[in-house]
Amino acid sequence: MKCCQAAAVAAVGAPKARMAGFYGAVGRRHVNLHRKYEVQQENMRFGMVNETILAIIIAFAISAALCPVVIPFLHRLKFGQQVRDDGPQSHLKKQGTPTMGGLIILTAIVITSLFYIRSYPRIIPILFVTVGFGIIGFLDDYIKIVMKRSEGLNPIQKLIGQFVITGIFTYYLMTSGEVGTEMLIPFTGGFENGYYLNLGWLFVPAVFFIVLGTDNGVNFTDGLDGLCTSVTILVATFFTVVAIGEDSGISPITGAVVGSLLGFLLFNVYPAKVFMGDTGSLALGGFVASSAFMMQMPIFIAVVGLIYLVEVLSVIIQVTYFKKTGGKRFFKMAPIHHHFELCGWSETRVVAVFSIVTAILCLVAYMGL
């Protein structure tokens, strides 16, 4: 009897043991697959880091190598900066310093990006906006410097060009299926758990407002030796770190901008041997705005690009106050970096403080992801 009971128990227990073994094997297989996926992701991210570092190095080398060649060439062509008579007196010695150095920055960015464009197709829209706005800046510089028309492109001409490029970029954002109309709200939990602002069709005017506002902000920031270059290096570095972490597929071009600006800064730092001109500043404004939109982060521009925002707001406040009060000035001079100069700050101090503020804001923004 006991033998029969033991046999029965063994017969019942055998399937359970087999089932336990089966589920155990499935569990181990699931864990192994998950681990394999994690390893693949780590390898991909490691590869992306290496490719981005290489992009920085290539762009830096191109930019640093071109500057000693292009700067004397700009000198010979007499492509010199025209300095305002009503500006800080310390700026009068800058008269004739070669400008249109943005051509160096753009060349380094474009050449570097071409190495990655097949593997990273998402850099194409950013490259389009950056180069497009750079062309507008080049035409503006060319008219002012070569054709000796101090006004450059008139506001309507410049606005038409910016509207066309921004319109094409907006169409891509809304129809490509890769970006959409959502914007990540800072400090709400990051890309996975955060809140997104969906504007629907209001997204269209929002893109125009943010892109053109950012572009003008970067343009106004380019008023001191190394200022726009230093601030934008930090902003581009922020986007590069986020792009790698989120695998957004744009890190090669953000890295290329970092590298090209580092190479350019060697010759743009005080006392500057070359200025980027509107060719560079408008291109960089387009880069900052388009990169932010490609990662659904345009709201973050108000944090990492606060200096740009303050610069453009200072001009708006100055002009409005001047008109309302019949000629009185709110600031000693606008954009605001000139106000600090007239308050007694040295040019290098303004650049250092603005750069430190930007670095801190980039860290704060990263904490908000």
Language-model regions: role of each:
Residues 3-4:
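Cysteine-centered motifs
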Residues 13, 21-27, 47:
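Residue-identity detector for glycine
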Residues 24, 31, 35-38:
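Short hydrophobic alpha-helical segments enriched in small aliphatic residues
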Residues 44-75, 105-135, 169-175, 181-183, ...:
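Alpha-helical transmembrane segments
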Residues 84-97, 148-162, 336-338, 342:
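Juxtamembrane helix-capping/reentrant segments at transmembrane boundaries
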Residues 122-154, 158-162:
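Hydrophobic alpha-helical hairpins/lids featuring a short glycine-rich hinge
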Residues 146, 178-194:
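Membrane-interface helix termini and inter-helical loops of multi-pass transporters
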